[in-house]
Amino acid sequence: MTKSGGRPFEVVVYGDEDSVLYHSLTSPIPALPQPEPSFDVTISKNSQPKGADLLMRNIVIVTINPKTFSRTSVKYERDVYAKNQIVIYVGSPSVSQLRKDMTTSSVITDLLTRQEMGAMVATLKDKHNPKMEETVRRMFGIEMRIPSDMKSCKEGKDFVWISNNSPTSMTNICIYTSENRDSVMRKNIKGETDNMYMTTNKESVISSIAKTQDRQVTVRRGLWEMKGDAMGGPFVSHTLHDIAGHKTLTIECFVYAPGTKKRNTLMRTEASLMTVKAAGR
């Protein structure tokens, strides 16, 4: 079977009357500096995928039929036409019913997000940095995949900062044994002077509970700023409890990419956070 293709977070939708799915899937991602859509959506004029579209990684097929559906239904299959592909089937008795259900349900967005994050985690299996991973294992007793381009490292007390040091799209991973982000960052990530240091825009932070690697994780998404300097960007942190001998362990990624879109860069870096597990497990 041929491997599926498409850009990250690209979705092709079929049968989307009145652009209901389009509006749902292009809603802005929270906690980014500028609005960016959840997905890059292409609406096909066809009712079913044909030709090259059969190889797309993310496909959504919508059917509106009151004789077939008494309520909105969402089902999915994997690897229908190509490897590493998801095809989501959405059925509803009417466009108005579908629109109502899409405003209260995130099931389709969640399915597609898991699909894309899974693809990014799979990429890390082939392109990662064993040297930095050994540093993380030595300091914190955990295993995780670090992107291959992250070659710069700064160690502190119960803290490590790993970065690709790119001047245009800097991606970073920090690990520390605390939930108090501001105190850790003020001590470890400074600007040109001691009066410049990283802080959190507290009004931007969104917290949720997720499950990864069979553990409950507190996920925080928000915006960081550099006090005393015109720098900032998005961050995502995963806080775990009672792992590898640590009462609390936070693994965070943040991005500094002025003047560019940040969704894909942040998500690609966040994939590393989803690979964390206690060493030896």
Whereabouts are the PLM-identified features?
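N-terminal "mature-domain start" segment
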Residues: 2-8, 17-19, 23, 35, ...
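Sec/Tat-exported extracytoplasmic proteins
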Residues: 5, 25-36, 112-119, 154, ...
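Acidic/His-rich structured neighborhood in mature extracellular/periplasmic domains
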Residues: 111, 115-172, 176-177
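Signature of long, low-cysteine stretches enriched in small and polar/charged residues
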Residues: 39, 44-96, 193-249, 260-262, ...
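Intrinsically disordered, low-complexity, charge-biased terminal/linker regions in eukaryotic proteins
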Residues: 1-55
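Surface-exposed amphipathic alpha-helical segments
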Residues: 99-119, 144, 150, 250-281
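Solvent-exposed alpha-helical segments and adjacent loops
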Residues: 1-14, 19, 65-130
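Secretory pathway targeting signatures of secreted, lumenal, and periplasmic proteins
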Residues: 2-4, 10-16, 23, 147-197, ...
